[in-house]
Amino acid sequence: MDLYAIVPVKELRHAKQRLAHALDAHERQELSLAMLGDVLAALSQSQVRRVTVISRDTAAYQIATAYGAVIAVDQTSDLNAALYQAAVDVPDDAAILIVPSDVPLLRADDVMMLAAQPGVAITPAHDGGTNLLLTPAIRGWTFLFGPDSFVRHCAEARRRGWTVHVVRLPHLERDIDEVDDLVWLAQQPGHTAAQRLAREFLMRKGARIW
C-alpha cells in the first residue's frame, strides 16, 4: 500500500505563542522552520510516496520545496478541514500519514513502523493529543485533531470497525510548545537542526541543561 504523508504548518507569525515569554518572534519562527525541516528530512528518507505540506506561509513553502514536498495552499482556517483539502487526491487504496510539523525527533523507521500496522495506527502525545496518525481509508475517516484527539481518533476508528494500533514512541510524544518542552528537546540525544537551535537558545538565555 502506498503511503502519502501530510504535514500541516501554521502561519509562522502565529507559531509557538506559548513560547513568547522565552523566545522572540524571530526565534520562534526560526525554531518552527528548523522543526519542519527535521520532519521533512525524516520523511524524505522513508518510503513515503508523496509528502504534502499544507500551509499559508511562504517560508514553509521554501522548506517544502527544498525537500521535494508538494505544496498545498491552505484555503481554510481549520486544521481538520485543511487535512481534507490536502488529502483530496490521495488514491482510495493508499494510506495517509498525518505528521505535525513540531515533532523534530521523527525518524524514517518511525514512519515505516506505523506503515506496517494494519488498520489505523496512532502515536499519542503526552497531553492527550495525536502526534502521528495513519489511516488506510481517507474517504471513510473523520479527522478530529484538537483537545483529547487521541481518545477521539481511537473511538472514531473503532466506531467504523477498524483495528486500532497504539504505537507509543517516547521521542515523539511531546510537541515543542512550552519552555519545558524546549529543554526536553535540547536534552535528548541527537543533533537535529531543531535540537541545535534549542540548545543555542537555552545557553544564550542562561539555561543550564546539562
Curated annotation (Swiss-Prot):
The exact nature of the substrate is currently not known. This entry has been annotated based on its similarity to Actinobacteria. The lineage of its organism: Bacteria, Bacillati, Chloroflexota, Chloroflexia, Chloroflexales. It is an enzyme of class 2 (transferase). This is Phosphoenolpyruvate guanylyltransferase. Belongs to the CofC family. It comes from Roseiflexus castenholzii (strain DSM 13941 / HLO8). One of its GO terms (biological process) is F420-0 metabolic process. Pathway: Cofactor biosynthesis; coenzyme F420 biosynthesis. Its EC number is 2.7.7.105. It holds the Pfam family CofC. SUPFAM superfamilies: Nucleotide-diphospho-sugar transferases (SSF53448). It catalyses: phosphoenolpyruvate + GTP + H(+) = enolpyruvoyl-2-diphospho-5'-guanosine + diphosphate. Keywords: GTP-binding, Nucleotide-binding, Nucleotidyltransferase, Transferase. Phosphoenolpyruvate binds at T130, G146, S149. GO terms for molecular function: GTP binding; phospholactate guanylyltransferase activity. Signal peptide: none annotated. It comes from the Bacteria. InterPro entries: CofC (IPR002835), Nucleotide-diphossugar_trans (IPR029044). Guanylyltransferase that catalyzes the activation of phosphoenolpyruvate (PEP) as enolpyruvoyl-2-diphospho-5'-guanosine, via the condensation of PEP with GTP. It is involved in the biosynthesis of coenzyme F420, a hydride carrier cofactor. HAMAP family: CofC. The gene is fbiD.
